Amino acid sequence: MAFQKAVKGTILVGGGALATVLGLSPFAHYRRKQVSLAYVEAAGYLTEPVNREPPSREAQLMTLKNTPEFDILVIGGGATGCGCALDAVTRGLKTALVERDDFSSGTSSRSTKLIHGGVRYLQKAIMNLDVEQYRMVKEALHERANLLEIAPHLSAPLPIMLPLYKWWQLPYYWVGIKMYDLVAGSQCLKSSYVLSKSRALEHFPMLQKDKLVGAIVYYDGQHNDARMNLAIALTAARYGAATANYMEVVSLLKKTDPETGKERVSGARCKDVLTGQEFDVRAKCVINASGPFTDSVRKMDDKNVVPICQPSAGVHIVMPGYYSPENMGLLDPATSDGRVIFFLPWEKMTIAGTTDTPTDVTHHPIPSEEDINFILNEVRNYLSSDVEVRRGDVLAAWSGIRPLVTDPKSADTQSISRNHVVDISDSGLITIAGGKWTTYRSMAEDTVDAAVKFHNLNAGPSRTVGLFLQGGKDWSPTLYIRLVQDYGLESEVAQHLAKTYGDKAFEVAKMASVTGKRWPVVGVRLVSEFPYIEAEVKYGIKEYACTAVDMISRRTRLAFLNVQAAEEALPRIVELMGRELNWSELRKQEELETATRFLYYEMGYKSRTEQLTDSTEISLLPSDIDRYKKRFHKFDEDEKGFITIVDVQRVLESINVQMDENTLHEILCEVDLNKNGQVELHEFLQLMSAVQKGRVSGSRLAILMKTAEENLDRRVPIPVDRSCGGL
């Protein structure tokens, strides 16, 4: 076995060397292409944005209605679709984009939040001497560097630790990671390095210590995916593209080409989802960039077309920030079933994922309990046994549909393409499918190149390399200090605004409400534990937010960070949006219900509430569960599913017990796993299970609730020393 591993390592080293040598010949064309692109960017003329601010949605709809014919109409408002619109409009093409939901409402907002070259692809490229895989990695690393440059406020390098538990893995993975640095060349973010066992545990104290021999740390990029997607859309709008969300394509328009006599796609019949109004948008070329819905649009063109999309669901979960170091991620390269799991800090929380399961295409993917538990089990395997990973620690969960594709022009139509595919139908519909977030720009460039060539459009080369996205041009790491000094914002809020809006953060700050406090002067928070402020709701409407779901999931990221916090903020968000958009009381109620449904099904709330008595982590007899539920509901009169300080105070007052708020707060915090000021039923059941199993000696809250229950039945006062005595 050891010999086998040694051979593997030798192959990796030899393959790496061979790939490096081969890079001088088969990859020379690719390198020349990159050099050529860089030269075009240096010498070409980049037009300034035609709009200082993105036009309103109403103005964009008027442009869509009144323009006789666009050069390009893009269907789909994800990263690739918005990238196509930006690429086309900056070439001087008259461009339109329509999206049936919100920008980034699908897969593009449900990623792992990484901007990466693909370490796994490089491993396959070297082991199999696969030129295509190498090209993919090389291209992705080039795009990674560009994305970090054009949106510095939304992205940053992130060190990722690869813990190793066998000695042979150290040289094996070290060579592979060093090859990753080598392929990146001058665009390498930072050089990878090896950590000893003790140093690895210093960085990641919760790591499984047994048999740990050391770790390797390498660098990739991380970003705020939905905000990045939105920045691309807003930049395209500022450059003159007519972009509109909530515009559904009902059918494709066609006309006969007078030269060939063939039918050509000439636009689309579009429906405003918010008003129901329909109208035609005509274009010389239509680009299908609809992600998982690729085949739905292709069937509008040709109902007999062979499907190319093979959808796969990837589930992620969010856990409290203390599960990972603040500035370092972790990679499990070989899970129990051969998948790869990332464990990453993001927005002061921890993201864990992903899974890879065949699925059906749907507008509302739901994370399954099976996938959530798979991720939790993998997390448990990598963390010390001292750390109890609980189902209740999952603050949010989501499923994104990866649009994996087969190449219709390939001889083997069943094999999934590892790269993106640009397909042109007989009627001229351009379809871009596959690929990954990191390479959205090069995918867009290839797509518009194909459109220009096939439809004989008058356009120059792509100009998007180095083109700053909305908010990036005048951003600096110290910009937040000016926000604190000039507007009187909290430092945490100012840092959040600078990271989210870049140089546009000042516009948000100007909208901030006065708090009425000595400090901060302005910036009323939507929820106390997150730095989102009310002014962001007003500004979000300028960024084309049309619904409460848009606001909690893509303008802010509350839904992706903590579903309960998002639910808590919803009434105020709906009130603020209703004021700005003149919503009726009925519309406000509908928005509240729709957003609550979104949190319940799509963001993991349903899975969470259904697992309150999951036997895998609560080992109580059914009779005990019933008894403890009854005790819990003595405090939770409204059947909310959780109790707060107010609930405890109410019960104590009813039995004539006085206790100061600070003591009560301390008692609840002992059990409050999510640190959200609430103790949920499953948290209480976990506590009682732990008490029975002897994992904890007792709990002040457990004693308090037991004593209160007894006295509520007997209606006699509880002695103060019993209610809050130490254990």
Swiss-Prot record:
Record GO biological process: camera-type eye development; gluconeogenesis; glycerol catabolic process; glycerol-3-phosphate metabolic process; glycerol-3-phosphate shuttle; multicellular organism growth
Matches recorded under SMART domains: EFh
Keywords: Calcium, FAD, Flavoprotein, Membrane, Metal-binding, Mitochondrion, Mitochondrion inner membrane, Oxidoreductase, Phosphoprotein, Repeat, Transit peptide
Domain EF-hand span(s) in chain numbering: 623-658, 659-694
InterPro entries recorded: DAO_C, DAO_C_sf, EF-hand-dom_pair, EF_Hand_1_Ca_BS, EF_hand_dom, FAD-dep_OxRdtase, FAD/NAD-bd_sf, G3P_DH_FAD-dep
EC number: 1.1.5.3
Major localization listed first in the record, in broad terms: mitochondrion
Binding positions (FAD): 71-99
Similarity field: Belongs to the FAD-dependent glycerol-3-phosphate dehydrogenase family.
Name recorded for this polypeptide: Glycerol-3-phosphate dehydrogenase, mitochondrial
Species for this entry: Mus musculus
